[in-house]
């Protein structure tokens, strides 16, 4: 027996559930299927379709006004779809025509692109560049094994700009370093060629001229090109910024390059294909080399403040720490020592990755004097460093087999008979054909320099590192709170190398110059207590201190054997430098190795020149990144500027006329599209509103149907229960009847019960009766009544809910309007479409503009014809004089009195032509002109009366006032050409 609940349940116990229960999705699918079947059955009926939902009127008032059946509804539906399709096709055609006209009007700029199709911006990044095939392109392709220049597109004409967002998405503001194998392969070919021809050099003389000289000297220039499916991404704008600042030492672990503008090309710029080691390069390479002088990004860096860091930030290309110049696969090209100056590992070779970041830039030799850097004369005698920089390559340099001076104006060239290719030296037994004795002032030169402390983001100034005994405790000389990442948080009042205990707990060595300028800060996480314990453990340093003694600029400690502790070559702590006799090692404090045994005196190293063609190409190729594309097409559109300039005024006028016509057509198209868009918007809004109401009504109808389904299920359960109770009642009545019957039989048989058995003297067949114990577990009449009451309550509640849902469904169904009523209810279309009444005026205006345009065209044609008819062209006539020529000059007869004898004969005035004479002359000119023999006869013949009137007005004035003038006109017979009389003498037009 179940307990009564607040929410009605569909059944009272599990055994009373119906045998099949359908889900809500199945019910909806069944409803949709039935609705579709009804629509298919009723499509062919003339009476039309009825409503697909059923409304139940609980109030007993059925709707009397049934909608009339629209027999044209199927036709209207298909007709509307056809109209919409036609409008869409018309709109697409109009847009296509518009785009075609716009494309036709725009002229190409002789600039074609490479169409890249891939992810995310048309390309994929290639990280392993050694697997990319490459070829060279040059003019002398048959001699050097390259392809001709036309084999690949010119990158200056055919490229594609890559957006900044795509660059940031692909490269994450990190333009990486790539060790390209292409220059290494060329260097390998040169080495192989030199080894194969080494025996032949001994037989050659200085007069022998080899074509290989052009290649060795770098005169053979070409491009590197990659085939499909690869391309090159050439950077156009870039800058550098620091990354991963070490909080202990303050140096930047990485210097990243952010490329903000790039182009996709197929070939690189022109560069020397091969060359030996040299100092200066040709002026053709100056722009490419200058591009590698990368500036710092416009972010908050200390080096950008000229007041804090004189000279600004570093400019150049940073070869990252850990880069391999010559990979392991081509280790035979390394040689014993690096010939590239600062481009070397910690052992001075190229076997290991770089341990220090190396900067390469085009040198600025403007401040050099006699081949030496600025302030070189102020250095200590014999020293190779000045202003914190140790210079290599000052003096004698190796250039294309010659020893030259670092002073370009001296012109020293001593041929050594040796050529350096990479790390190997090859003999060259005859003098090359090139000349190096010229003044190479103004030629671009590579400069390789290293910041050993790697604090380029803080300052570009190089310093002389402090020795470990030239320090003092900064008591009272350092004020403020500064750190390795914040040099501006403190001030110094005295020059020196001050050992300072920072607020973070570590030790700092603050380098102060000029009593107030902080030029560097070196730090470590080791605190003062730990350092002092190490210091006290040094031999004979128990009573010593690090206080400053002496009056020098830097000062020193009292005992040189008790300087700042460091780790010796055995990695043990010591406070004294190693000695050998009277000589003592100079040990310095380094920013990245505070406790190490550092012997580098200067924080910077610089090298001038010394790069061969391999490194030259390697540096220029860092501007490019290899990408992989799915497909690209080349196309060259040659539209020279002279082609456009050669067009005459005729073509320009026709083009302007076409543009005006296109403008009028575009206005008409836009007006039509606006009308179509307005109609489409209205129908779309109406459809949306009607769909919204329909969706609500259908949802309510579904809810009502669900409630009715629950009522039916509950009724079915109640009927089952009643039927079961009736069967039980029948069984009980039958049992009572049988019991009474048997009792009567027992009485008649005179039997008695003994242990549930009937003992009688009658036969056993008569006394064998049915056992009725199986009915003992049946429910009682009281339980049955309780279940019936629960069913009645459940059924009544479900009926009330079903009635409410049906009422809501009726209300929502009545709210479903037709399309136009939905539009009127959603928007105030009376004001929205008030402009529709002006459509006839708009159409009239457009038609008027078209008519006005046609009229203007006709008038322009008439004016052109009028100008041609008005301007009378005279024919050239050759006059043959048959009368004899009088050689003697006769006395002139001057009738105007200039000779003293005036003529008394009245002067004959030329009378003005009458209107009839002008008409005859004009008509005769018209008949003999070519205008009357074409289709333009009728438009032009209407101009003849106006032309005659105009000529008559020119001769007689606007109202004939020229005839009434009595003033004698002056006639200049020499300067004025008289017009022949048209009534007698006619000229040919």
Swiss-Prot record:
Gene3D superfamilies with a match to the protein in the record: ATP synthase delta/epsilon subunit, C-terminal domain (1.20.5.440)
Taxonomy, superkingdom: Viruses
Lipidated sites in chain (S-palmitoyl cysteine): 862
GO CC list: host cell plasma membrane; membrane; viral envelope; virion membrane
Region described as Immunosuppression: 729-745
Posttranslational modification: Specific enzymatic cleavages in vivo yield mature proteins. Envelope glycoproteins are synthesized as an inactive precursor that is N-glycosylated and processed likely by host cell furin or by a furin-like protease in the Golgi to yield the mature SU and TM proteins. The cleavage site between SU and TM requires the minimal sequence [KR]-X-[KR]-R.
Cystine pairings recorded for this chain: none
Ranges where the record places region Fusion peptide: 663-683
Coiled coil: 695-745, 786-821
Endpoints of the signal sequence: 1-106
Extracellular-facing ranges: 107-838
Glycan-modified residues: 140, 161, 206, 258, 298, 364, 381, 387, 403, 435, 439, 470, 475, 481, 491, 501, 515, 527, 537, 542-543, 551, 568, 703, 771, 778, 794, 828
TM region(s), chain numbering: 839-859
Cytoplasmic side, ranges: 860-989
Subunit text: The mature envelope protein (Env) consists of a trimer of SU-TM heterodimers attached by noncovalent interactions or by a labile interchain disulfide bond.
Name of this chain's protein: Envelope glycoprotein gp160
Species, as recorded: Maedi visna virus (strain 1514 / clone LV1-1KS1) (MVV)
Gene label: env
């Amino acid at each position: 027996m179940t307990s009564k609940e607040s929410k009605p349940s569909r059944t009272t116990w599990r055994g009373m559930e119906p045998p099949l229960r359908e889900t809500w999705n199945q019910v909806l699918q069944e409803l949709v299927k039935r609705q579709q079947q009804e629509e298919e059955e009723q499509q062919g009926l003339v009476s039309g379709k009825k409503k697909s939902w059923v409304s139940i009127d609980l109030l007993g008032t059925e709707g009397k006004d049934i909608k009339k059946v629209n027999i044209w509804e199927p036709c209207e539906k298909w007709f509307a779809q056809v109209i919409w399709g036609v409008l869409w096709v018309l709109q697409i055609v109009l847009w296509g025509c518009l785009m075609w006209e716009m494309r036709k009007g725009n002229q190409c700029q002789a600039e074609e692109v490479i169409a890249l199709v891939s992810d995310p911006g048309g390309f994929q990044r290639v990280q392993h560049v050694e697997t990319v095939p490459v070829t060279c392109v040059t003019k002398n392709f048959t001699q050097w094994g390259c392809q001709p220049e036309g084999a690949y597109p010119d990158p200056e004409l055919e490229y594609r700009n890559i957006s900044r967002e795509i660059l940031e998405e692909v490269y994450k503001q990190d333009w990486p370093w790539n060790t390209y194998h292409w220059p290494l392969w060329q260097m390998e070919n040169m080495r192989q060629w030199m080894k194969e021809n080494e025996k032949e050099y001994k037989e050659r003389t200085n007069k022998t001229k080899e074509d290989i000289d052009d290649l060795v000297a770098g005169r053979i220039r070409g491009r590197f090109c990659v085939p499909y499916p690869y391309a090159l991404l050439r950077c156009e704008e870039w800058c550098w910024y620091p990354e991963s600042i070490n909080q202990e030492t303050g140096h930047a672990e990485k210097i990243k390059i952010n490329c903000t503008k790039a182009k996709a090309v197929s070939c690189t710029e022109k560069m020397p294909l091969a060359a030996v080691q040299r100092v200066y390069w040709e002026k053709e390479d100056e722009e490419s080399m200058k591009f590698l002088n990368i500036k710092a990004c416009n972010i908050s860096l200390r080096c950008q403040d000229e007041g804090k860091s004189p000279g600004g930030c570093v400019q150049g290309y940073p070869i990252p720490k850990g880069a391999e110049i010559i990979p392991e696969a081509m280790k035979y090209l390394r040689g014993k020592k690096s010939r590239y100056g600062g481009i070397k590992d910690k052992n001075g070779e190229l076997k290991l990755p770089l341990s220090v970041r190396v900067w390469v830039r085009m040198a600025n030799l403007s401040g050099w004097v006699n081949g030496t850097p600025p302030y070189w004369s102020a250095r200590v005698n014999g020293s190779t460093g000045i202003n914190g920089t140790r210079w290599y390559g000052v003096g004698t340099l190796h250039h294309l087999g010659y020893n030259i001076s670092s002073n370009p104006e001296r012109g020293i060239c001593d041929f050594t008979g040796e050529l350096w290719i990479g790390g190997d030296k090859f003999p060259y037994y005859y003098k090359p054909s090139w000349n190096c004795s010229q003044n190479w002032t103004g030629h671009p030169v590579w400069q390789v320099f290293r910041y050993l402390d790697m604090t380029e983001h803080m300052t570009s100034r190089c310093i002389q590192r402090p020795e470990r005994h030239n320090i003092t405790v900064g008591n009272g000389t350092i004020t403020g709170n500064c750190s390795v990442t914040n040099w501006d948080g403190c001030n110094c009042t005295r020059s020196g190398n001050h050992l300072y205990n920072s607020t973070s707990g570590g030790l700092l060595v603050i380098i102060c110059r000029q009593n107030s300028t902080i030029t560097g800060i070196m730090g470590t996480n080791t605190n003062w207590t730990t350092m002092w314990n190490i210091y006290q453990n040094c031999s004979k340093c128990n009573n010593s201190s690090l206080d400053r003694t002496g009056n020098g600029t830097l000062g020193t400690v009292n005992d040189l054997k008790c300087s700042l502790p460091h780790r010796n070559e055995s990695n043990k702590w010591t406070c004294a430098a190693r000695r050998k006799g009277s000589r003592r090692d100079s040990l310095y404090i380094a920013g990245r190795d505070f406790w190490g045994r550092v012997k580098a005196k200067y924080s910077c190293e610089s090298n001038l020149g010394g790069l061969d063609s391999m490194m030259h190409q390697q540096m220029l190729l860092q501007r490019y990144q290899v990408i992989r594309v799915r497909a690209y097409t080349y196309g060259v559109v040659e539209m020279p500027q002279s082609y456009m300039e050669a067009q005459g005024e005729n073509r320009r006028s026709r083009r302007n006329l076409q543009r005006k016509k296109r403008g009028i057509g575009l206005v008409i198209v836009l007006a039509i599209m606006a009308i179509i868009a307005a109609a489409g918007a209205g129908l779309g809004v109406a459809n949306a509103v009607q769909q919204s109401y329909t969706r609500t009504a259908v949802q309510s109808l579904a809810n009502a149907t669900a409630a009715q389904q629950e009522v039916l299920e509950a009724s079915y359960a109640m009927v089952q229960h009643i039927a079961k109770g009736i069967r039980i009642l029948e069984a009980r009545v039958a049992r009572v009847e049988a019991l009474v019957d048997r009792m009567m039989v027992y009485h008649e048989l005179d039997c008695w019960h003994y242990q549930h058995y009937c003992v009688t003297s009658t036969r056993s067949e008569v006394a064998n009766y049915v056992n009725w114990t199986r009915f003992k577990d049946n429910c009682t009449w009281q339980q049955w009544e309780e279940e019936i009451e629960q069913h009645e309550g459940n059924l009544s509640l479900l009926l009330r809910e079903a009635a409410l849902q049906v009422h809501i469904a009726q209300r929502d169904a009545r709210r479903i309007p037709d399309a136009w009523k939905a539009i009127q209810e959603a928007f105030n279309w009376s004001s929205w479409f008030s402009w529709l009444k002006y459509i006839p005026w708009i159409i009239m205006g457009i038609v008027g503009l078209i008519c006005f345009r046609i009229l203007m065209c006709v008038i322009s044609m008439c004016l052109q014809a009028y100008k041609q008819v008005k301007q009378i062209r005279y024919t050239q006539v050759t006059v043959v004089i048959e009368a004899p020529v009088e050689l003697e000059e006769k006395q002139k007869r001057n009738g105007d009195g200039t000779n003293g004898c005036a003529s008394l004969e009245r002067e004959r005035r030329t009378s003005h032509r009458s209107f009839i004479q002008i008409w005859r002359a004009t008509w005769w000119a018209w008949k003999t002109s070519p205008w009357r023999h074409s289709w333009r006869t009728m438009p032009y013949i209407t101009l003849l009366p106006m032309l005659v009137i105009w000529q008559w007005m020119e001769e007689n004035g606007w109202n004939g006032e020229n005839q009434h003038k009595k003033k004698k006109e002056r006639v200049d017979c020499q300067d004025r050409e008289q017009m022949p009389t048209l009534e007698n003498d006619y000229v040919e037009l």
